[in-house]
UniProtKB/Swiss-Prot annotation:
It catalyses: a long-chain fatty aldehyde + FMNH2 + O2 = a long-chain fatty acid + hnu + FMN + H2O + 2 H(+). This is Alkanal monooxygenase beta chain. Its EC number is 1.14.14.3. Belongs to the bacterial luciferase oxidoreductase family. It comes from Kryptophanaron alfredi symbiont. Heterodimer of an alpha and a beta chain. It is an enzyme of class 1 (oxidoreductase). Keywords: Flavoprotein, FMN, Luminescence, Monooxygenase, Oxidoreductase, Photoprotein. Light-emitting reaction in luminous bacteria. The specific role of the beta subunit is unknown, but it is absolutely required for bioluminescence activity. GO terms for biological process: bioluminescence. Signal peptide: none annotated. One of its GO terms (molecular function) is alkanal monooxygenase (FMN-linked) activity.
Amino acid sequence: MKFGLFFQNFLSENQSSE
């Protein structure tokens, strides 16, 4: 599912922000 990929990307970005 594309949604899963988008969600993972969002999480990855969130971690990068920290």
